[in-house]
Amino acid sequence: DLAILPDGEGNLWLGTLSALVHFNPEKRSFTTIEKEKDGTPVVLKQITTLFRDSHKRLWIGGEEGISVYQQEGLEIQKAAILPASNVTKLFTNCIYEASNGVIWIGTREGFYCLNEKDKQIKRYNTTNGLPNNVVYGILEDSFGRLWLSTNRGISCFNPETEKFRNFTESDGLQSNQFNTSSYCRTSAGQMYFGGINGITTFRPELLLDN
C-alpha cells in the first residue's frame, strides 16, 4: 500500500511500509525523510494515510497510530498537540478535519475525535452504536454529519446527538465491506465509498429515513 498527498507545491508526499518519502516530479527525485529538523530520527511503520489540516500541518497515520508534524519544504518537526493517550497509538486508517476544525480519526478499533482546543479525545465504537470497529473512511455532509465506511456497512454519525444511523447491503450498498483510502466527496456533495464489490455513491440530503 502507498499513501499519497500533494504538498501544495507540485510535489508529492509518499507514505510507504517503512518511511516517509518526498517526490519531486520535475526532477524525478525521491528524498527519504530520516530526521526531524532538530535531528530526532523519524521512525514510521506501515503508513496508511497522509493528511494536511487547515493549519498546514502534516498528519501521518499507520500501524503505530498518528503523528503530527509542522512542515516547511523537506523539513519536518513534530508538533506537540496530541494529548497523552493510548488511543492515539491505535492502527490508523484515515484522518479527517470537519468544518468546525475538529479532527476525526478512523482506526481498527473504532474512531475518535481530537478536540485540540480542549485537549480532549473521545472514542466511539460498537458499544456506542458503530456497526463495526474498523473505520476506513470519514466524510462530512452539508448538515455536519459524518459518514463512515466500515467492515459492516456505512454509518451516519451525528456529532451533536452522538447517534449512529447504520446502512447495510440490504439498503443498496455494494457490499458491507469497504476499503482503506477509498472515499471522496465532490464539491456538489456527492459521496463515494469504494468496497470489495465496487463503489457506493449517494447524496446524503436525498436519503430518507423509513
Where are the regions that the model predicts?
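Carboxylate-rich, polar loop motifs that coordinate divalent cations or form catalytic acidic clusters
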Residues: 1-210
